[in-house]
Design a protein with these regions (language model features):
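Nuclease catalytic cores that cleave nucleic-acid phosphodiester bonds
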Residues: 20-23, 30-32, 38-43, 49-140
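Metal-dependent nucleic-acid phosphoesterase active-site entry motif
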Residues: 1-34
Length: 140
């Protein structure tokens, strides 16, 4: 399937998180699509997923929710990182490329991550499914 939006043209192919050894999750983005944000943390802990939860904290307005998400990370014993200088989807890509590379993935709903990724796969979470995204406008 192809998608065109204000950020470019993208190919989306169905995929699954089980195909990746580690995930870097853009928490604000994914949690916003769930009816209960705690479900993201609880289900990851119960499934034993190797994941890094990247939380937006680069603006004062993020802090109340960031504190809540950090508390959920602690409660469920998950690895969380604050993105204090840039949007979490971009920091997640940087962490993934630096720490893990091929075989790992960033999970987000934001296409900026696809444009920024070099070695890591980006999975777009839409309508309860994961889609491996490729930037078709690259090199065009």
């Amino acid at each position: 399937m192809q998608v065109k939006n204000r950020k470019g043209r993208f190919s989306l192919q169905p995929d699954s998180i089980v195909n990746y050894r580690r995930l870097y999750i853009d928490v604000f983005s994914v949690a916003a699509s769930l009816s209960q944000s705690e479900e993201l943390f609880r289900s990851a802990a119960e499934a034993g997923v190797d994941a890094v939860f990247v939380i937006d904290a680069w603006h004062e307005s993020h802090m109340p929710l960031a504190r809540r998400y950090l508390e959920l990370c602690r409660r469920y014993g998950l690895d969380c990182r604050l993105s204090e200088q840039k949007p979490a989807e971009i920091y997640a890509v940087e962490l993934c490329d630096a720490e893990c590379g091929a075989g790992c993935a960033v999970v987000t709903r934001d296409y900026d991550a696809v444009k920024a990724a070099e070695r890591c796969t980006v999975l777009i979470f839409q309508r309860g499914r994961f889609w491996r995204a490729e930037d078709l406008s690259r090199g065009a």
